Each structure stands twice: as structure tokens, then as C-alpha cells.
Amino acid sequence: MTLNDLLVLPHDQIDYASLDAAVLHELATQNSEPYIATSALAELGARGGPDARAAAVAILAAVPWDRHLVAFAITTLCDVDCGSAIETMERLLGGTHDPKVLGAMVECVLSYPDHFGTGPGHAFTDRLAAKVETVEPDQFTDLDERAAFLARYRST
């Protein structure tokens, strides 16, 4: 099947596990079908390694077109390359107030606290906490996660 053949199928009718990494990368980085993109990225993430990293980096380097995909790409990148995720989140932080995207960043910090305790990661958490505080709490999907993050990283 070609990429176009796959894109006309409902997202839940595609057998992502049977597709090779190159096709999954194409599906993950296309910008017309968000459910397909997210599902393809999920399969790459489940496989781990450089293919998941490459797709997440490509999604995050492109003009954002789906906030859920961007958020998922952030958590995927954090899972496979936390150092690169810190740099990428730092770049994205100044341009977003989207609680979905900020929530993904919060999830990364809480999932990998060792990477955010010192150096660039710690400096990032300070800026992220300041940004999170500017967004109404009820805008976040996970209020407990937001509260836990602010309790731990909010500047005093």
C-alpha cells in the first residue's frame, strides 16, 4: 500500500505493527490526518530507538498543526532522548501557552526528574513553572500532575 492508500483508511483500520519504520515515519510526519500521525508515532515509540526520535524531532521542527500530536511527540522524544527533548522543549516553551503542550512538558519533567535536577534541565523547569502558573489550572488535563509539578519546581 502507498502512503495515499493508507491515508484514506480510518486510523483504526491500519495495522501499524506490520509497517516498516520508513512508512511509519511518513505517516507520523504527514500533516493531514492527526489520528494516523499519532498512531504511527505511537508504534515507532513502542519500537523505541532512532526511528521514534527522528519522527518526534521532525514533528516538533515543523509548523504545529495538531496540539495533541505535538504533545505526544514531546513525550515520545523525552522517552527516547531526554537531552534532545530538553533542548526542543526549551525552544518551544517561549512560543506556547497551550495547556496540552505545557502538560506534555510537565509530564516529561515528572517522568525523568534526574534529567531536570541540574544544569540546562533545571533552568528549563524554572521557566516552565513560571509559564504553567500563567495558565488557568482548569485548562490542564491533569490537575494533580500540574499541582505536583508546581509543588516541586515553583520558584519560592
Predicted segments with their positions:
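Buried hydrophobic core positions in alpha-solenoid tandem helical repeats
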Residues: 23-25, 55-60, 88-90, 121, ...
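Structural detector for internal amphipathic alpha-helices that build alpha-solenoid repeat scaffolds
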Residues: 1-17, 26-30, 34-49, 58, ...
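Short, conserved active-site loop motifs that form the nucleotide-linked donor/cofactor pocket
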Residues: 85
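Alpha-helical junction/boundary sensor with strong preference for TPR arrays
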Residues: 31, 63, 96, 132-139
